[in-house]
Amino acid sequence: MNSFGIRFKFTSFGESHGQAIGCVIDGMPAGVKFDFDFLQEMLDKRKPGQNKFSTPRKEEDKAQVLSGVFEGYTTGTPISVLVYNENTRSKDYEKDVFRPAHADFTYYHKYGIRDYRGGGRASARESIARVAAGALAQMLLKEFDIEIMSGVFGVGSIDSKLSNDEFDFNCAKNSEVYALDKNLEQSFKDEILKAKKAKDSIGARVFTRVKNPIKGLGEPLYDKLDSKLAHAIMGVNAVKAIEIGSGIQSSYMYGSQNNDELKDGVFLSNHSGGILGGISNGGFIDIKTYFKPTPSIFLPQQTQNIQGENIIRELKGRHDPCVGIRGSIVVNAMVAICMADALLLNASSNLQNLQRVYGKNK
């Protein structure tokens, strides 16, 4: 639906070419220091039109916080964030034509009506709401020294050979394409521009790490931390697969290779990706996310119109040649939301926690 989370919950609203995109965050505890500059920084990292590796649609994406914050701190009431759309160009979209590999076809057959302008609700423009909610989640996580970092480790046929521990998040922070490998940053850029010049698009791969996760986060059996992360990330536009820890590679291993042995309270490896039995074990939570190529390309393609007629169309509009670049910011936000939700849920997981909250320790 349009909401995500149990205790830390957000609801998003708005369409690509509507008046605004926004979200309402419910469950944020009172007393968390609110950092508006950080919120805007996260939105700026996601916003379009920053360079030639992104869509040429330029939006300022300035956040307006309408409620839930007073004198620099959260009040415990719903926090609403609004971002206005200021640079729409709806004439680029045809009302009766299904764009290949887009949600046009499925939305129409589900609802019998669709907002065709820029993909409407199915547009990645909606991810503004996710990034805003994720920024609030990170403000909460910061109070517990939990840090979430993401970047791009592969574009097209080019993959970094660095290990998870060797990825350079400082490089990603300063890179136009959020590259985790300085030696491949230019190759990533070249690959994107090559696809763009050919009127095509290209896929990408993102790595996310949660540092300092508290042990015990996750709600088995049906709200396991890894299943919630998969749920959250697979809901991001253009994501087709994720891996946690060794992921697919673990299916090629023996148990003796895949098991993370424990000595003196420390795991000697991290094939599990920091999660055992759906619960965090205190190690790094390592996630890889795989983005398909942006479906909006400028080559002739076969499709159909609403009347069922076969037609050939070249798309118009302004689109990312590689959606995974800005998508890395959205994945980071959704991981933060999952971790904040798990943190709050865990507060009532046992009697001792509740006794500490209410000063009833025996």
From Swiss-Prot:
GO terms for biological process, alphabetical: amino acid biosynthetic process; aromatic amino acid family biosynthetic process; chorismate biosynthetic process
Binding of NADP(+), residues: R46
Any one GO MF annotation of this record: FMN binding
Co-factor remark: Reduced FMN (FMNH(2)).
EC number(s) recorded for this UniProt protein: 4.2.3.5
Reaction(s) catalysed (UniProt annotation): 5-O-(1-carboxyvinyl)-3-phosphoshikimate = chorismate + phosphate
Top EC category: lyase
Pathway: Metabolic intermediate biosynthesis; chorismate biosynthesis; chorismate from D-erythrose 4-phosphate and phosphoenolpyruvate: step 7/7
Family annotation (Pfam families): Chorismate_synt
Name the UniProt record assigns to this protein: Chorismate synthase
Cellular component annotations (GO), alphabetically ordered: cytosol
Cofactor names: FMNH2
Residues binding FMN, per UniProt: R121, A122, S123, N237, A238, G277, K292, P293, T294, P295, S296, R318
Protein role: This reaction introduces a second double bond into the aromatic ring system.
Lineage, highest ranks first: Bacteria, Pseudomonadati, Campylobacterota, Epsilonproteobacteria, Campylobacterales
NADP in keyword set: yes
The entry's keywords: Amino-acid biosynthesis, Aromatic amino acid biosynthesis, FAD, Flavoprotein, FMN, Lyase, NADP
Assigned protein family: Belongs to the chorismate synthase family.
Subunit structure: Homotetramer.
CDD domains: Chorismate_synthase
